[in-house]
Amino acid sequence: MKVLVVLLVTLVAVAYAAPGPRGLFINLEDGEICVNSMQCKSRCCQHDTILGIARCTHKAMENSECSPKTLYGIYYRCPCERGLTCEGDRSIIGAITNTNYGVCLDSTRSKQ
């Protein structure tokens, strides 16, 4: 138990000692390895396969494939950029398997 506490304290100290605005565990740039979308500046941690390495990447642009939400913090398809909505079918099974895909659409443009 002591070893775990010491390891945790050391990990936190290293994270806070990181120079500049970019940390070791947060504010990661596109292309850097991540384990959760909250670590990325873009707020999208994506992998291609279940065993693939997840990396930070930009959010989906208009007319690109997207995922509306994730239960796990890692996407197969990133959510849409600000101002766009991910339009597509949603199901409980798709939410669990992280396969609820849609297409990013500009909701203001589609109403006109």
UniProtKB/Swiss-Prot annotation:
It comes from the Eukaryota. Gene3D superfamilies: Lipase, subunit A. It is found in: Secreted. GO terms for cellular component: extracellular region. Induction: Expression levels increase upon lipid ingestion. Keywords: Digestion, Disulfide bond, Lipid degradation, Lipid metabolism, Secreted, Signal. Residues 18-22 form a propeptide. SMART domains: COLIPASE. Residues 1-17 form the signal peptide. GO terms for biological process: digestion; lipid catabolic process; post-embryonic development; response to bacterium; response to food; retinoid metabolic process. Its main location: secreted. One of its GO terms (molecular function) is lipase binding. Pfam families: Colipase, Colipase_C. Expressed by the pancreas. Disulfide bonds join 34-45, 40-56, 44-78, 66-86, 80-104. Colipase is a cofactor of pancreatic lipase. It allows the lipase to anchor itself to the lipid-water interface. Without colipase the enzyme is washed off by bile salts, which have an inhibitory effect on the lipase. Belongs to the colipase family. Forms a 1:1 stoichiometric complex with pancreatic lipase. This is Colipase. It comes from Rattus norvegicus. The gene is Clps.
